[in-house]
């Protein structure tokens, strides 16, 4: 957050594109409810601009952007659009309910993109820049234009396009490092030279959008700001296409911790960063790497004796920020089988969750069941319970019961009962091991041709009674769907995770039946 002594000139707008560029990451597809949940969290956290999706891509994307626009209280709601007029008009319709809406239109400007992707001459691209921005400006005063693959674009042509876009009404100019090719010094110089060369550059805010292909997305983002950009486009956990995007939590904390070298400020409530990371991880079923900066499990862990000794004497010996600054409060052992509804509600609020009365009741029932099986219920256990309720509460296929017979000799056999859209089904199946038997049972109960791409297990907490958290990724018709589930029984968690991915496939198929939009390429 900021103080009254900080100038508006040094403010950096945080533009979150988790719901658009982040969701383009293979396997990271989110359901409608998951998108609403993530958007609400971003809005509460102080994100200035939420790029909520690509309305022309599908009816599902349109509906999500439209609903987020209706519900947002603080953030500008932005929709992405190609340079085509029909895309822009659809985007305008999607963001219409927003108190403050933005249209973000883009066009490739690099020689390789113009020749092979657009198959257009530079003169045609130049005219389309003017046409698209003008069209968008007819709908809203807040228009962003992106020169896709700006870092591989000829400088003179880039400046001409930027000047034309600003003259046509663009209020934000984004120069994305689409393929993660730039290095910090040249990216800083690009912004400095563009702002120095383009005669009307003072009429627009400049923006960075960096991909992490060479591991320099955050460094490049900060370099762009040093060169004069005042908007950073980023995603929670750095998710995105290929190697991902600049991570929101990293750019925000870089500005917070290194004010001596990065004298800029933003409006993000940093104590929500860890919760935001976990929310997006749960929605996408993408685990956060243990050594991830700021929000990783080991970000504030110290194992070596020398480090521990230093921490005991003075935390500043090995910590450049406090865990509390980013919302890490440490694991607590206060919850158990004697805890009541009020205690659970308080704990969930402490962890950053806001649930409806029905959702609270469902979580409480499962919490009591877990507490009967587990001596201590950690914060991570409660987060797993809540995430499962939020992500799988509306599933059409639900696990009712599971029995597995396994041993060193003889067949591994699973018996399962499912509720499939209100219909109870029971089946028994064998497999090459208990997990294989469980998955074969699901295939027998719900016939499908999805292929298993990933099966991963790790413990939510420590100890032999820890919940197992299982991630499953299924591939179907060229799309990957990932789901995650937790349970003290690894096989139950495995079944729930598999069913979670299958439910996403079912939901996607149902949306596809209703949709009749062409497949479209999106900006990076």
From Swiss-Prot:
Signal peptide: none annotated. Pathway: Amino-acid biosynthesis; L-leucine biosynthesis; L-leucine from 3-methyl-2-oxobutanoate: step 1/4. Its main location: cytoplasm. Residues 398-524 are annotated as: Regulatory domain. It catalyses: 3-methyl-2-oxobutanoate + acetyl-CoA + H2O = (2S)-2-isopropylmalate + CoA + H(+). Keywords: Amino-acid biosynthesis, Branched-chain amino acid biosynthesis, Cytoplasm, Leucine biosynthesis, Manganese, Metal-binding, Transferase. Mn(2+) binds at residues 21, 209, 211, 245. GO terms for biological process: L-leucine biosynthetic process. It comes from the Bacteria. It is found in: Cytoplasm. Coiled coil: none annotated. Its cofactor is Mn(2+). Residues 12-274 form the Pyruvate carboxyltransferase domain. Its EC number is 2.3.3.13. GO terms for molecular function: 2-isopropylmalate synthase activity; acetyl-CoA C-acetyltransferase activity; manganese ion binding. One of its GO terms (cellular component) is cytosol. InterPro entries: 2-IPM_HCS-like, 2-isopropylmalate_synth_dimer, AIPM/Hcit_synth_CS, Aldolase_TIM, LeuA/HCS_post-cat, LeuA_allosteric_dom_sf, LeuA_bact_synth, PYR_CT. HAMAP family: LeuA_type1 (MF_01025). Belongs to the alpha-IPM synthase/homocitrate synthase family. LeuA type 1 subfamily. Homodimer. Catalyzes the condensation of the acetyl group of acetyl-CoA with 3-methyl-2-oxobutanoate (2-ketoisovalerate) to form 3-carboxy-3-hydroxy-4-methylpentanoate (2-isopropylmalate). NCBIfam families: leuA_bact, PRK00915.1-3, PRK00915.1-4. This is 2-isopropylmalate synthase. It comes from Rhodopseudomonas palustris (strain TIE-1). The gene is leuA.
């Amino acid at each position: 957050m900021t103080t009254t002594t900080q100038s508006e000139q040094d403010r950096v707008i945080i533009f979150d594109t988790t719901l658009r560029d982040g969701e383009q990451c293979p396997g990271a597809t989110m359901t409608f409810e998951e998108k609403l949940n993530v958007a609400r969290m971003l809005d509460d956290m102080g994100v200035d601009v939420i790029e909520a999706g690509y309305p022309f891509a599908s009816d599902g994307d349109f509906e999500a952007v439209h609903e987020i626009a209706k519900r947002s209280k603080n953030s500008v709601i932005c929709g992405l659009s190609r340079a085509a007029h029909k895309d822009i008009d659809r985007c305008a319709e999607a963001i219409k309910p927003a108190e403050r809406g933005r249209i973000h239109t883009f066009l490739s400007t690099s020689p390789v993109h113009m020749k092979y992707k657009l198959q257009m001459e530079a003169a045609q691209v130049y005219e389309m820049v003017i046409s698209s921005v003008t069209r968008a400006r007819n709908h809203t005063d807040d228009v962003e234009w992106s020169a896709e693959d700006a870092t591989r674009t000829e400088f003179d042509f880039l400046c001409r396009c930027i000047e034309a876009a600003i003259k046509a009404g663009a209020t934000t100019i984004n120069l994305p490092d689409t393929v993660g090719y730039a290095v910090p010094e040249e990216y800083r110089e690009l912004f400095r030279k563009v702002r120095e060369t383009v005669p009307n550059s003072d009429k627009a805010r400049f923006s960075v959008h960096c991909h992490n292909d060479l591991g320099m997305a955050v460094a490049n983002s900060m370099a762009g700001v040093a060169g004069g950009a005042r908007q950073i486009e980023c995603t929670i956990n750095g998710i995105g296409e290929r190697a991902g995007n600049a991570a929101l939590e990293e750019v925000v904390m870089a500005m917070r911790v290194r004010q001596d070298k990065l004298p800029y400020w933003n409006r993000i409530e940093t104590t929500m960063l860890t919760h935001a990371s976990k929310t997006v991880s749960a929605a996408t079923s993408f685990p956060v790497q243990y050594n991830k900066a700021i929000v990783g499990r080991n970000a504030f862990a110290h194992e070596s004796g020398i480090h521990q000794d230093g921490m005991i004497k003075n935390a500043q010996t090995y910590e450049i920020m406090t865990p509390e600054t980013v919302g890490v409060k440490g694991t607590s052992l206060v919850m158990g089988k004697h805890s009541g509804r009020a205690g659970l509600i308080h704990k969930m609020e402490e962890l950053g969750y806001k649930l409806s009365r029905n959702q609270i009741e469902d979580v409480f029932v499962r919490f009591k069941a877990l507490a009967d099986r587990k001596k201590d219920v950690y914060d991570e256990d409660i987060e797993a319970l809540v995430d499962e309720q939020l992500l799988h509460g509306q599933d059409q296929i639900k696990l009712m019961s599971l029995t597995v017979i396994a041993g060193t000799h003889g067949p591994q056999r699973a018996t399962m009962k499912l509720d499939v859209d209100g219909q109870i089904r029971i089946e028994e199946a064998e497999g090459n091991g208990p997990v294989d038997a469980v998955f074969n049972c699901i295939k027998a109960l719900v016939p499908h041709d999805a292929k298993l791409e990933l099966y991963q297990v790790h413990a939510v907490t420590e100890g032999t009674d820890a919940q197992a958290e299982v991630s499953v990724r299924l591939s179907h018709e060229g799309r990957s769907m990932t789901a995650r589930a937790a349970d003290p029984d690894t096989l139950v968690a495995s079944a729930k995770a598999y069913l979670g991915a299958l439910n996403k496939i079912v939901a996607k198929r149902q949306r596809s039946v209703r949709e009749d939009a062409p497949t479209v390429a999106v900006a990076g």
